[in-house]
Swiss-Prot record:
Stored InterPro entries: Bulb-type_lectin_dom, Bulb-type_lectin_dom_sf, Kinase-like_dom_sf, Pan_app, Prot_kinase_dom, S-locus_recpt_kinase_C, S_locus_glycoprot_dom, Ser-Thr/Tyr_kinase_cat_dom
Domain Protein kinase: residue ranges: 501-786
Residue span, PAN domain: 337-423
Cytoplasmic side: 455-814
Glycosylation sites: N43, N54, N89, N95, N253, N271, N324, N334, N340, N383
Disulfide bonds: C286-C298, C292-C306, C376-C397, C380-C386
Species annotation: Arabidopsis thaliana (Mouse-ear cress)
Protein name from the UniProt record: G-type lectin S-receptor-like serine/threonine-protein kinase At1g61370
One cellular component term from this protein's GO annotations in UniProt: plasma membrane
Length: 814
């Protein structure tokens, strides 16, 4: 290479070092930004340049997160008018304005303002804000944060300024490939306290509820468990207000709030592995504004449903029956409205208040400042126009002087709303309650009489035939259980390590009795199950559990460490499970978030592994007979362990099924043939596994899930969902972002196969394992039976049936 070539190469290398990757620090009159060039923030978090949505021919100037794929655009300059050729510049013109021009100097976009300074430059700040700066005073003359598109970043805000007629909102894209303004706008209202709204054109689409210092009352998910935190500053006298948000855990500054073209407001952050949706609204059809019409209550169940508030009836029964609820409801009884101003308003000829819990406060409220809760009620009672009031600790007194619209009830969270009714509504309700209470009292008395008689008969027979009376010494028990190689603990040790069964050591309460935590001398933690005298688990079940668990060892079965029998005390000692039972997670609004879909799928597979061992791989063939979510324990790593073998039965040789005259189990989990004929087999456990599988997917209890006027059960709802959409929409909405649609749909189909009415139509556990771990084609399930309705109680019910006449003879909490 000659000297000239060497000099040229060195010069070129020098220029590349000085001006790398066609990126530079600022836009000036002399240095415009052209297609193919980018402007980066100082630390390289954001980047400004030209882009084409989904590789369309249209070019836009936008800001996005740098070096993150796929590209997330957070601001667009020329969203109304794209550049359609490859010759365009973002520059500062002679009038002192930032403009986008294409061929022949046609102005595509400008900031709409001009400045007289001769030293103007445009920079992209590290917070993602594009600013036009006066180089003389170093003052920001214009900034993109004051002209938002569909996205708000950490240091930007939506706001209103009434005196100056200004409002800063988020405006959705028209569609994912067209950034021009769509039909949705997110804004902050001027009410006191303010609300967040999504408007669809000129009509409300979603409402966040009154602001309560740190949360919107219509978003119960804003419970402090999320990484994002909102803040609203409102100056009522000045007529201004603004909303910003920040990240509580600042291990990442990559976050944005966006309004999608479908009308969904999402707060998204990057946890280092990818983008995660922290909060989203709306998430349910109940969230859509005024779904149930005036004085209608939208129940945020799955799926949502509408009801009239107490004391109200549908305006049109015909429309209501068609599920067209927008007409709402009307009062059944007019208010007396004697302008009462004291507590005597509760008298029969006055008006009263009915309290509705867990609701989003209605729209169109009035804030009454500086009064307490009692005065709030009296102010409403003394005003004939007042239809309801709510006293919210972080707000104060809110009253409503018109129809109640956009009222929603949550499963948990929300506020308390007191609705004004005619006193006759309460009187009628009280009469019904008295009648019901009388019937229940008489029924309970009769049941107790018969139960006492049969219990006396049962105890008399037990005294004649029981091979080991409760009073028998521990030595006799040792002799009886000697072949099982069971460890015996003495009672004094148990009393010491449980601090005399103190409340501090109590882990929980089951139908069998309490469970306590203890620490052995070597520091090992154990769980002690203490059989209570009122438990439905008798001597037979106690012995059964010891004999079975002592012979069964598997990573997905709870391990028995020993027992203690002294006098009437019977105790079982197990390995300690740090996370208690599965039901404490999936049915808890906060804890359920710790079990995303991948973890739930692992738990499902673990339970199936445990059942496979019981049915096929152990030295015994065991039918559990009481598979349910509360009998699945979780260790410190959330590995599932099947527990409670008191009702389990062993099968011998070629035996595949058995019959019992004493049907025991938990309502909702019992297969049809077992509940009504006493016939049980491995397929009985498969049925219960199917129910359990659907509970894990949905996060809903079989014992409390009913929807619609016809009272559909969880199983029926799962069947309808599978028929309509393949079942992928069944996943618990609180963790839906973590789920694989195909995986969820597959598990729903497996669950439906497991709950088939005929035992022969259900797969065995080996087939279930293959279905869960392979991509084999699944058979189509038949419509399951939905005959058995289950009512929720404080504890799950273990039910015993006499199969002679299929009548319930005893119910024992379990």
């Amino acid at each position: 290479m000659g000297k000239i070539g060497i000099v040229f190469f060195a010069s070129l290398l020098f220029l590349l070092i000085i001006f790398p990757s066609c990126a530079f620090a600022a836009i000036t009159r002399a240095s415009p930004l052209s297609i193919g060039q980018t402007l980066s923030s100082p630390n390289g978090t954001y980047e400004l340049g030209f882009f084409s949505p989904n590789n369309s021919r249209n070019q836009y100037v936008g800001i996005w997160f740098k070096n993150i794929t796929p590209r997330v655009v957070v601001w667009v300059a020329n969203r109304d008018k794209p550049v359609t050729n490859n010759a365009a510049n973002l520059t500062i013109n002679s009038n002192g304005s930032l403009i986008l021009v294409e061929r022949e100097q046609n102005v595509v976009w400008s900031i709409g303002e001009t400045f007289s300074s001769n030293e103007l430059r445009a920079e992209l700040l590290e917070n993602g804000n594009l600013v036009l700066i006066d180089g003389v005073s170093e003052r920001n003359l214009w900034e993109s944060f004051e002209h938002l598109g569909d996205t708000m970043l950490l240091e930007s805000s939506v706001m209103y300024d009434v005196p100056n007629n200004k409002k800063r909102v988020l405006s959705s894209w028209k569609n994912p490939t067209d950034p021009s303004p769509g039909e949705f706008v997110a804004e902050l209202t001027t009410q006191v306290p303010p609300q967040g709204f999504i408007m669809r054109g000129s009509r409300p689409y979603w409402r966040g509820g009154p602001w309560a210092r740190v949360r919107f009352t219509g978003i119960p998910e804003m419970d402090g468990s999320h990484v994002s935190k909102f803040d609203i500053s409102q100056d009522v006298a000045a007529g201004t207000g603004s909303l910003t948000y920040s990240l509580e855990r600042r291990n990442s500054n990559l976050s944005y709030t966006t309004l999608t073209s479908a009308g969904s407001l999402k707060i998204i952050w990057n946890n280092g592995s990818g983008w995660v949706t922290d909060l989203e609204a709306p998430v349910s059809s109940c969230d859509v504004y005024n779904t149930c019409g005036p004085f209608g209550l939208c129940i945020r169940s799955n799926p949502p449903k509408c009801e009239c508030l107490k004391g109200f009836v549908p305006k049109s029964d015909e429309e209501w029956n068609k599920r067209n609820w927008t007409g709402g409801c009307m009062r059944r009884t007019n208010l007396s409205c004697d302008v009462n101003s004291s507590a005597t308003a509760q008298a029969n000829n006055g008006d009263i208040f009915d309290i509705v819990a867990n609701v989003k406060p209605p729209d169109f409220y009035e804030y009454l400042s500086l009064i307490n809760e009692e005065d709030c009620q009296q102010r409403c009672l003394g005003n004939c126009s007042c239809t309801a009031f709510s006293y919210i600790e972080q707000i104060g007194c809110l009253v409503w002087n018109r129809e109640l619209v956009d009222v929603m009830q949550f499963v948990a969270g929300g506020e308390t709303l007191s609705i004004r009714l005619a006193s006759s509504e309460l009187a009628g309700s009280n009469r019904v309650k008295i009648i019901v209470a009388s019937i229940v009292s008489i029924s309970v008395f009769m049941i107790l009489v018969f139960a006492s008689y049969w219990y006396w008969r049962y105890k008399a027979k037990q005294n004649d035939s029981n091979p080991i009376p409760l009073e028998t010494s521990q030595d006799a028990w040792r002799e009886q259980l000697k072949p099982q190689d069971v460890n015996f603990f003495d009672m004094q040790t148990i009393l010491t390590i449980t601090n005399n069964f103190s409340m501090e050591n109590k882990l929980g309460q089951g139908g069998f009795g309490p469970v306590y935590k203890g620490n052995l001398q070597d520091g090992k933690e154990i769980a002690i199950k203490r059989l209570s005298s009122t438990s439905g688990q008798g001597l037979e079940e106690f012995m059964n559990e010891i004999i079975l668990i002592s012979k069964l060892q598997h990573r997905n079965l709870v391990r028995l460490l020993g027992c203690c029998i002294e006098g009437e005390e019977k105790l079982l000692i197990y390995e300690f499970m740090a996370n208690k039972s599965l039901n404490t997670f999936i049915f808890d609004s906060t804890k359920k978030l710790e079990l995303d879909w991948p973890k739930r799928f692992e738990i499902i597979q673990g339970i199936a592994c445990g059942l496979l061992y019981l049915h096929r791989d152990s030295c015994l063939r065991v039918v559990h007979r009481d598979m349910k979510v509360s009998n699945i324990l979780l260790d410190e790593e959330m590995n599932p362990k099947i527990s409670d073998f008191g009702l389990a039965r062993m099968f011998q040789g070629t035996q595949h099924q058995a019959n019992t005259r004493r049907v025991v189990g938990t309502l909702g989990y019992m297969s049809p043939e077992y509940a009504w004929t006493g016939m049980f087999s491995e397929k009985s456990d498969i049925y219960a596994f199917g129910v359990l599988l659907l509970e894990i997917i949905t996060g809903k209890r079989i014992s409390s899930f009913t929807i619609g006027e016809e009272g559909k059960t969880l199983l029926e709802f799962a069947w309808d969902s599978w028929c309509e959409s393949g079942g992928s929409d069944l996943l618990d909405q609180d963790i839906s972002s973590s789920g694989s649609e195909s995986e969820v749909a597959r598990c729903v189909q497996i669950g439906l196969l497991c709950i088939q009415q005929q035992a022969g139509d259900r797969p065995n556990i080996a087939q279930v394992m293959s279905m869960l771990t392979t991509t084999m084609d699944l058979p189509k399930p038949k419509q399951p039976v939905f005959a058995m309705q289950v009512q929720e109680s404080d504890s799950e019910s273990k039910t015993m049936y006499s199969v002679n006449n299929i009548t319930q003879t005893a119910i024992v909490g379990r």
